[in-house]
Amino acid sequence: MNRLRRSDGEQTYAAILETAVRLASIEGLSTLTLGRLAEEAGVSKSGLYAHFGSKQQLELDIIQAARDIFEREVIQPALAADEGLPQLEQICASYLSYIERRVFPGGCFFAGMLAEFDARSGTAAHDAVASDQQGWTELLESFAAVARERGQLKRSTDVPQLVFDLTAAVELANYYHVLFGNPKVLDRARTAIDTAIAANRP
C-alpha cells in the first residue's frame, strides 16, 4: 500500500511538472504562480506545497524537468553520432528539429529562460540557467575542438567564434520561429550553419 501511494505521488508530481514546464515555456517561469499552476494542473495549492515546498523549489524542479527533455531531444542524438564534426552538425540539426516540432509550446525553454533571467543575478533560477548555458557552450566547443584535432576542421579554426556563430543561428531561428511562425527561418539557420562550418573545413 505504501509503495502504491508513493507511485501515485510520483505520477502526480510528474503530471504537475509536465503542466508547469508547458506553462513556463509560454508565460515565463518567474511569473508562474502556485495558484495558476494549481488551477491548470487540477490540484490544490496545499497539494503543490506538499510536492515542492516553495516557489524556488518549484522553479528549480521545472528547470530540471526541462533539462531532461532537452537532453533527450537535442544532446543525446549528438552524443550517439561519430565524434567531432558529425556531433557538432548533429547537435545543430537536433536543436532545429526540436524547435520545429515545438517540443516546448513556447519554443526552446532555455532560450526563453535566458531572456527572462539574464539580468536577475543572485537567484537560484538565474544561476541554474546560466550554468546550463555555459554547459551548452562548452559541449559545442568540445565537439568543435575534437573536429579540429581530427583534421575535420582547419587547424586555424577559432573554436569559440565558430560555436558563437552556430549558437546565434539556432537561437535566432528559435525566436523567429516562435514570433512569426515561419518555417523558412529554420532553412536560413541551416544555411548559416552550413556556411559557418564550410568556412572552417580544411
Where are these regions (language model features)?
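Basic, helix-initiating cap at the start of DNA-binding domains
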Residues: 1-27, 31-40, 57-60
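Short hydrophobic/aromatic patch on the recognition helix
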Residues: 41-52
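Hydrophobic alpha-helical connector segments
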Residues: 61, 75-106, 159-166
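Amphipathic alpha-helical packing segments from all-alpha helical-bundle domains
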Residues: 71, 105, 122-149, 161-164
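Hydrophobic alpha-helical segments that form the core
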Residues: 106, 111, 155-176, 191-196
